[in-house]
Structure formats: C-alpha cells, structure tokens
C-alpha cells in the first residue's frame, strides 16, 4: 500500500503551522483523508495535491508514448515485410516475370520481343 503526504493549510488561519495529511492511494477515489493532527479549523482546510496521474504520467507524455508506439509498430511492420520478401527466393513465385526470367516465358507470353541482333565485332577479321 503506497502513501504520499500532502501539505494542508487552514483556510482562515494562515499563521498556523502546516499540517501533514497522509492520503492513501487506494482510498483516493473516495477522497478519504487522514490528518495526523486535529485543529479547530480542520473542517475549513484546503488540501492541495498533485494532479491524479496514471503510470505513464501526464496527458502529454501519454500522447508522446502513443505516437512513439504507433511509429515503432509501423517501422517493425515495414522492416518485417522487407525481410520477409528478401528471404524469399524468386523460384518460389510463379508470376509472368519469374516465368520469363526462367526461360519459359516464350511459351506463356506470345508477345515476347525477339532478341536484338548482336553488334558486329571489329576483331572478327572481316573488313
């Protein structure tokens, strides 16, 4: 059970010493408060404590954490898909490009361009 201390100052008696109030985190939602000293003006005391925060902190920190986690998930998704594609062999796919690269594209692709003629070599001995 975690507790923290809150400084309380009487509303009408600012010259009185500050009272220490101990508030239990488990009872915070019910606003239960335990004072370690009793004064005549205890009913009119103003108690101030830091705003109620979750484990992540303020709203700005939650927003930054959400943005960072979304960015991280997107990066891992991108990198994972790239690694998956690079580890796969082209022979595992059977699309038209892979068939053409394996040399059997002329069977399935009637619009294949004929091979270009070879350039004449000047070292062939003919003039």
From Swiss-Prot:
It comes from the Eukaryota. GO terms for cellular component: plasma membrane. It is a single-pass membrane protein. Changing residue 74 to T: In strain: Dahl salt-resistant. Keywords: Cell membrane, Membrane, Transmembrane, Transmembrane helix. Residues 89-127 are cytoplasmic. This is Dual endothelin-1/VEGF signal peptide receptor. The gene is Fbxw7-as1.
């Amino acid at each position: 059970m975690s507790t923290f201390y809150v400084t309380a100052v009487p509303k009408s008696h600012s010259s009185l010493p500050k009272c220490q109030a101990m508030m239990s985190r488990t009872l915070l939602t019910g606003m239960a408060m335990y004072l370690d000293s009793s004064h005549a003006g205890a009913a009119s005391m103003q108690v101030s404590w830091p705003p109620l925060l979750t484990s992540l902190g303020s709203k700005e920190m939650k927003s930054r954490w959400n943005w960072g986690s979304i960015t991280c998930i997107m990066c891992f998704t991108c990198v994972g898909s790239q690694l998956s594609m690079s580890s796969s062999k082209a022979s595992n796919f059977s699309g038209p490009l892979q068939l053409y690269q394996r040399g059997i594209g002329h069977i399935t692709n009637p619009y294949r361009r004929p091979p270009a003629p070879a350039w004449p070599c000047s070292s062939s001995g003919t003039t």
